[in-house]
Structures are given as C-alpha cells and as structure tokens.
Design a protein with these regions (language model features):
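Charged interaction scaffolds used for protein-protein
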Residues: 1-11, 30-52, 64-115
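N-terminal first-folded block
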Residues: 18-28
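Short capping micro-motif at the N-terminus of alpha-helices
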Residues: 14-16
Length: 115
C-alpha cells in the first residue's frame, strides 16, 4: 500500500508493509498497533490525543517508502511548512487498510500458534 503526497512542494512517498511495524518499534520503542488504537480512543476525548504518535507514524510510513530518509527530527526539519493533521488525513485510507491487514494477519498467526 503506497501513497504520494506533496508536502512543502516536495513529492513524498508513504508506504506500509509488515516491516513498518518493526521500523516503528525499533525507532520509537513503542508498539504501532497499540499507539494507533490509543489514537482511536482520543477521538472521544481529544485531551488524550498523542500528537507524537501521529508524527511518528507519518515518519515510519515515509521511511518505509524511502529508506534514505533521515531520523525523524532531521526529516521534519527539512520542511518549512507541514500540516501534520492534513497529512494524517490524506494517509487515513493507507493507515486503515494497513491496520486491517496487520490485525487480520496477527489474528491468523495467533490461531496458528494455538493449534
């Protein structure tokens, strides 16, 4: 699953694969699916919104599409303007499909391990 967006006049590719979860965990020492689930809960209570998780997920999708992207701080500093919520909104379909696929695969793996 891939998507290209224009951010600050630059074409940026975003991609989600099975490796995205590992990349996210290794970079941020946090579980992607748990953080994504917490974002869903924040819809009911915006005070619980973890803005850093959104930034981290966006970076992980970009890094998956382009391994040459630098660390998150350097990458975000490369933009004069970036609307995180606009980017997140544009990536919502990619994120939804990815999470559906990942949770489906995780469920299958758990069932196979139990048998």
């Amino acid at each position: 699953m891939e998507k290209t967006l224009t951010i600050d006049g630059k074409m940026i590719k975003f991609k989600c694969t099975g490796g995205t979860l590992m990349r996210y965990r290794n970079q941020f020492n946090s579980e992607f699916l748990a953080d994504f689930s917490a974002l869903g809960a924040a819809q009911k209570d915006p005070a619980k919104l973890n803005f850093a998780s959104i930034e981290n997920m966006i970076w992980a999708f970009a890094k998956t599409a382009d391994p040459t992207i630098p660390d998150p701080q350097t990458w975000y500093d490369s933009f004069d303007e970036i609307d995180i919520f606009e980017v997140w909104g544009e990536l919502s379909e990619l994120v939804s499909k990815a999470v559906k696929t990942l949770t489906k695969n995780a469920g299958r793996a758990a069932n196979q391990a139990a048998n």
